[in-house]
């Protein structure tokens, strides 16, 4: 029997220390609000197995600068990176077809998004 691993909530060992989060192989999803307001997170390295990022998963991660999605992320939820004010660049595979409502709203440092498969950008996706 195969299991799906989804990160539901992230709690750092040292709340005041900046960390580089590495999700282990086998994780297929980051749940809604899993990293919400976790200012400790500086970067995220996701496994090939990741296919879904939930609503507001990284909302308010003000120190998040870099996100690495090496696999085939097909769904990124609403407000997933909202208010990630330090996020500068993010790259997705061709499997992502839609940038949902307010995905990067308030991500004021964002200057580059590579998403070659996107055919739909919903409202407020990049609103400053």
Sequence positions of predicted segments:
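Structural signature of tandem-repeat unit edges
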Residues: 1-4, 14-29, 39-52, 62-75, ...
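Short amphipathic alpha-helical surface micro-motifs
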Residues: 3-6, 81, 104
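Intrinsically disordered, low-complexity boundary segments flanking structured domains
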Residues: 6-10, 55, 101
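Pocket-edge structural micro-motifs
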Residues: 9, 25, 32
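N-terminal regions of proteins, emphasizing targeting and processing segments when present
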Residues: 10-11, 77-80, 122-125
């Amino acid at each position: 029997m195969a299991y799906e691993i989804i990160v539901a909530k992230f709690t750092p060992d040292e709340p005041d220390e900046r960390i580089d989060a590495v999700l282990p192989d086998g994780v297929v999803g980051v749940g809604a609000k899993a990293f919400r307001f976790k200012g400790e997170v500086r970067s995220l390295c996701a496994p090939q197995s990741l296919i879904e990022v939930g609503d507001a998963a990284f909302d308010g991660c003000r120190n998040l600068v870099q996100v690495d999605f090496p696999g085939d992320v097909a769904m990124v939820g609403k407000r997933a990176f909202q208010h990630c004010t330090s996020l500068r660049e993010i790259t997705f595979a061709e499997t992502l077809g839609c940038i949902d409502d307010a995905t990067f709203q308030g991500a004021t440092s964002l200057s580059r998004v590579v998403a070659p498969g996107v055919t739909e950008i919903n409202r407020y996706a990049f609103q400053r």
